[in-house]
Every structure is written in structure tokens, then in C-alpha cells.
From Swiss-Prot:
Function: Catalyzes the acyloin condensation reaction between C atoms 2 and 3 of pyruvate and glyceraldehyde 3-phosphate to yield 1-deoxy-D-xylulose-5-phosphate (DXP).
Disulfide bonds: none
UniProt GO molecular function: 1-deoxy-D-xylulose-5-phosphate synthase activity; magnesium ion binding; thiamine pyrophosphate binding
Family to which the UniProt record says this protein belongs: Belongs to the transketolase family. DXPS subfamily.
Any Gene Ontology CC annotation: cytosol
Cofactor(s) required, per the database record: Mg(2+); thiamine diphosphate
InterPro entries: Dxylulose-5-P_synthase (IPR005477), THDP-binding (IPR029061), Transketo_C/PFOR_II (IPR009014), Transketolase-like_Pyr-bd (IPR005475), Transketolase_BS (IPR020826), Transketolase_C (IPR033248), Transketolase_CS (IPR049557)
Name under which the protein is recorded: 1-deoxy-D-xylulose-5-phosphate synthase
Originating species: Prochlorococcus marinus (strain MIT 9312)
Enzyme Commission number(s) from the entry: 2.2.1.7
GO biological process: 1-deoxy-D-xylulose 5-phosphate biosynthetic process; isopentenyl diphosphate biosynthetic process, methylerythritol 4-phosphate pathway; terpenoid biosynthetic process; thiamine biosynthetic process
Pfam families: DXP_synthase_N, Transket_pyr, Transketolase_C
Record field: catalytic activity: D-glyceraldehyde 3-phosphate + pyruvate + H(+) = 1-deoxy-D-xylulose 5-phosphate + CO2
Amino acid sequence: MLLSELSHPNELHGLTVSQLEEIACQIRERHLQVVSTSGGHLGPGLGVVELTLALYQTLDLDSDRVVWDVGHQGYPHKLITGRFSQFDSLRQQNGVAGYLKRSESKFDHFGAGHASTSISAALGMAIARDRKGENHKCVAVIGDGALTGGMALEAINHAGHLPNTPLVVVLNDNDMSISPPVGALSSYLNKVRLSPPLQFLSDSVQESVKNIPLIGKDIPEELKNIKGSVRRLAVPKVGAVFEELGFTYMGPIDGHDIENLINTFNAAHRLKKPVLVHIVTTKGKGYPYAEADQVGYHAQSAFDLTTGKSIPSKKPKPVSYSKIFGQTLLKICEQDSKVIGITAAMATGTGLDILQKNIPEQYVDVGIAEQHAVTLAAGMSCDGLKPVVAIYSTFLQRAFDQLIHDVGIQNLPVSFVLDRAGIVGADGPTHQGQYDISYMRSIPNFVLMAPKDESELQRMLITSINHKGPTALRIPRGSGLGVAVMDEGWEPLNIGEAEILEEGNDILIIAYGSMVASAIETAEILKGMNINTCIVNARFVKPLDKNLIIPLASRIQKVVTMEEGTLIGGFGSAIVELFNDNEVNIPVYRIGIPDVLVDHASPDQSKEKLGLMPDQMADKIIQKFKLNN
């Protein structure tokens, strides 16, 4: 059977193991073809092909529920649930999303982009099923990296307390999240991974007991307890953590042996209780380059399938903001041993990999544990260290209470560097960094800043580390502007001090962070229409430079704010509040992201749809203030 002919996942039910293995090869071929052409997540999906096929042969996806954690693993799922022909549009505007999305397919039972949510969602579905008197199966598929997240452990704790609630948790253990997982749980799984299967040994003990004369089929409770003890003696520690938490543990199982996987899943479904099936897979399976470099091939831009090398862009791009940050922090750490870089499983993405390689004693990776990262940093700062928490804007949302309770209220000197702030592109609404200005501006004691270019990033970083209270510095995804940077001698900024970049009397544009460059382009367009613009680089949204902004606004009388963030509670709102609090009655036109979810597309496509391109903004300004008369 051809993968392209598969119209419904239930069509897998009648296939032989050899036919499923053939489809597995076709899935990998299609997966590699599309990702090598347009980019996307590579390694995670390649590792779960057999797991997906075997699991779906044991389920009826018209009624059963499967929740995939994160969604990185979801490409094989998409290919066998009716999206084969559209898969070329992966992560492109109006195309197939890179993550599971309920609005895209009835088989995407729960959307996700952030880690560690699957067990909670699947347990919620299982409880709803039981309350309604239904009997369909509920399954969560979670990676070992996502299992380090506190939310996953909270869900396991809850599910284990419900012994009569059938739930299957499939642990896809590839010894890797995006980067290698860290912590005691990861070390524990490493030991388990090398052990023989547990549940089947347990069953063989039970069969032996059944054959004892005088007992027959009835096994007294005492002997059941003995069975458990024998199991522990035979395979010490294997699965003990999960069993003590109320789960029946099965595994570890070879995640690329389809026949064994099918048998295991069928056995798990029959138990009618919380079960954890431990599957050992190879991230990047079937593509040697991805197997050899599991971090580098987690996600890829377009690459040559033959060589595995990225296809260079036609025009060389400047160094990314993330790398500039990482390189600068490394220099600072070399000069000050109290500075500590902290990440939540995103060393490469945030640029901290260079610190990890060069000064590992000043680097901490907490795993997928954003809440812990924030409070860990707070504790460090209490005793004289200078923590710098590098984290994606979208992921810091998960630690909002810790920002308030553990950092803001205590006014602790913790520096946050919010990567991927603003429009991120192909990862879509779960990853857009559009909310951080709004959610952090409300926290007392925080100083919020954003650089206009790479050089200002360096100055803001040293400003943050030197500041005696909490700070948040937001940087955009992707390349910088090509502005020269320094290896040392960065001059700190005065907190709350903006700068005038261009003088003009017709319009005042106050721009924040990445939108400063767009403001300059917009001003050039307006200049061609004899409209002279005053451009202010705000630098800070909290505190604002009211001594600069209010006099300029009072003189020019027409104010435009520009931000790459949501308008509700954002930078523009801060300007309006400043004027209102100081009884300045001046019209303000706010340009930013309206109250919408920004879907997957290229950053420029998203900005164009939102009206954030310079030519669009120039037209809006002309219409708003009737400057074309």
C-alpha cells in the first residue's frame, strides 16, 4: 500500500507488519523531501514513525484520543491523517501547520507548541469520557525532555491517584529534547533504558504462580505482593518511580520494532488503568546525518539531502541577535565569575551554547522548567550571583507567577533576555513573542528595554547586569542589521533614557526595539511626500523618558507609536497612559499587533497581513492624520 493512498488512519488496521514497515519508509522519504526543501522539524518526527504506525493500528481515531506533546513529533501523524498531498505547504502561509492544530484536522485532538501539556490534556479527556459513560481510549505521547517539565509530573501525580481511569502515557525516550535533557530524571531514564522489559517479566512471574498446585487461577493478595517484590529483585529500580506513583510500567521497548510495539500497546489498552509505556527511539532515525547530530537536526532550514548541509542563502545575512547576545555574555562572564547564564533546554536557540562550551561552570540548563529557572535565578541573586535568564518570550509566559512573586515583589537583580520577541514566523501562534511587553509591564520594579540594533543590545546587556533590580531585555528572532559590535568596553545606558534619531516637525514616531528600523524606513517614505518626521528610539518601555517624549509630543501634536507586540497593554498603551497621567491631550496612533492570533507564515508575510510593513504604515499615518491634503 502507498502512503499517498491512505485516506484515513483506520486503514492501517488491516495491514501486515511488513506493509507497515513499507509505509514507514515512505513516511521518512516524504518527511525528508519536504523538510529539506522548505525547512522544519526533522529529527523528532523521524524518530517516531514506527511508534505512530503501531499505536494507530491499535486505535480507532474516529473515537479514541491521542495527544501529542509539543507537536515536534507530529509530522508522521499528519502524513497518515489526510495531509499527505498538502504536506509540501508545511509551515507556509495558509499551509499545513508545523504543530498539531484542532482547527486543521479532526484527528488533531489537542493543539500544542509548548512542552509538557499532553498528560494533563489526555487525563482531562479520560475523566470526561468516564463521566459520560463512554469507553474510548485516551493516550498521551510525551518525550523524555518534556517529562522534565513540572506540569507533566503534576499530571502523573494526579493520574496515578485515579487507579480506575484508563490512560496510556507513551514515553518517547530518545535521550533528547531539543538539546540533551538534564537532571536526575534524565539520569534515571538512562539507567532504565539499558534494562530488560519489566511488565513482561512481571507477567511471566504471574503465569508461574498460576501453575502452582492448590492455587490455580486465583492469586491471593499476598502473592500479588510477593510478585511485585520478585519483580523488583529481578530488575532493580526499573520503572519503580512510575509504579510508586500509581502507574503500571511497561518497557523499555524498542521503538522501531513495529510488531513488538503493537503487542505492547494492545497489552497496555487491556489493563484499563494508568499505564506508562516506555519506548526507546532514535531521534533522526533513518537519516544518518540527523542520527549523528541530533541537536543540529532537531529543526533545519532547507538543506541538501545528499550532503546534509544547509543550503546557503543567496545573500549573506548578518549574525543573529541570539549569537551576538551569547558572544557578549561570554565576554562578560570571562570578566566576572558571578555572572551565570541560565536556560530552559534552549542553549543553542538562545545563544548560550557558546557559554556552555567555554565556561560550563557559569552555565545552567534546568531542562524544560521555566518556572524553576526563574525562581532558581531569584535564589542565586539573593546570595550575590548575577543570573542572566535567556528564554524565549513565548516560554516565559509559563513563569508569570514566579516573575511577580519571586522576582518582582522582592526587587531582585535578575536579568531576563527574551529571545524570539515579536513575530517569529513559521512556528505560528503558539510561538509568537507578542505578549511580553504587556504581561511584564504590569509587574512592579521591572525595567523593560529593547535594542534598535546589535550594538545597543550589548549596551543593554551590561546595563541589565549592572542594575540593582529586575530587568527584561527583548530581542527579535533572526539576523541583526549588520551593525558593528564591540568585544569589550560597552557603555551602560542610563535607565529610562530615550534618544532622538531624526528631527522633524510634522509627525513624531516613537518606536520600540525592532520597530525602530521600520520607523526609519517609514520616515523615508513620508519624506518623499514632504512630511518631516521626528523619530525617537524609546529604548525603554518602563520607565519611559517622559522628559524627552512629552515636550516633543506637545510641540509636534501628532504622535505615532510602533511596536512588534500586541497593542493591548503594550508600548503604545504605555505612551497613552503617560500622556493621560500628565494631562497631555494629544492624539496617539498606535501601530502594532491587534487582538488577533498570528498564524504561521514568513515574518514578512505576517507583518504584511498585520499592516506592519513600512509602506503600509506610511499610508496609515497619512490617512490617520489627513496629511495628503
